[in-house]
């Protein structure tokens, strides 16, 4: 039997339409005006002006829509389960909303309206298509002095000559979007450190990503291809292990082509030791010279995967301070102190450090620093610089 929702007077047991008629603020209701079947992806309680609002993100027909409910439906309905739902359209003088009225758990297959793509092409980005596709998750980094995170995936891509290759593609997200994207993977937690732990544990794992939007950006003669997370985007561990795309991604160890950049790819290295120096000039073009040692770097960037004879060498990378953004002297000195602190903490074995860099394709392998991740093993806590 379907459960009927209740609103403000939630324990009254009165039918919704009758309670609305008795409310002090007149409302017009179209009861059960629409029925849907879908999977509850997540739910959230919001407190605005001392009034509670209950929101539900439900996926139906490969789209995630948000609906209002009440405390009873919030208590009854469980994330990850599927429901047959009837909806009310409620209209007042100042607002209109769609609310869950009756709901009943059901069995259903979540079908995708958009078919799975075996590979990406330039057309997907030209048309800004939303795609469902199998990907390898590589890593996430946070840009220094920014609140922006970048997620790096590997995916099969066919160029204009129809030649398939495994390439890197990047996706920009803020903290809230990142938590929402992986909320089902971390059991509904709102702690971003839980997201970082999950992602570190699942580096190089194969996922299926749904409703990710392709985007093309022009900068002079260069074309950059990126992904955008939209409201209906979701990601889950891939179960199609027999597919050709899964096999291609699994067999690729280090993609050197990044379609989100020009003649560079993104790499991450666990650092043994690190040192940095601030270089300033009269033009205000400040940069940090960051040198580090890593046992992994020479293996990962060697074309034949052989190790260098000198694994203990210093590797030079550069972080350019954003000259388009006014950087106060105090902020620059704070960043200088942070780099210095990381060096000392690493030397004293109090933290572990991962560095994220762009690597130029070609002989020089010049590197620019993107981000630094600190890991406190005692607290099991990750923090980006």
From Swiss-Prot:
The UniProt record lists the keyword Cell membrane: no
Record function comment: Single-stranded DNA-binding protein that plays a role in viral DNA replication. Forms a stable complex with the alkaline nuclease and mediates the transport of the helicase to the host nucleus.
Localization (cell): Host nucleus
Name of the gene this protein is made from: LEF-3
Keywords of this entry: DNA-binding, Early protein, Host nucleus, Transcription, Transcription regulation
Primary residence: host cell
Superkingdom of the organism of origin: Viruses
Pfam families: Baculo_LEF-3
Any GO molecular function: DNA binding
Statement: the UniProt record of this protein carries the keyword Transferase: no
Family of the protein in this entry: Belongs to the baculoviridae LEF-3 family.
Protein name per the record: Late expression factor 3
Cellular component annotations (GO), alphabetically ordered: nuclear viral factory
Subunit description: Homotrimer. Interacts with alkaline nuclease. Interacts with HELI and IE1.
A GO biological process held by the record: regulation of DNA-templated transcription
Residues covered by region (Nuclear localization signal): 26-32
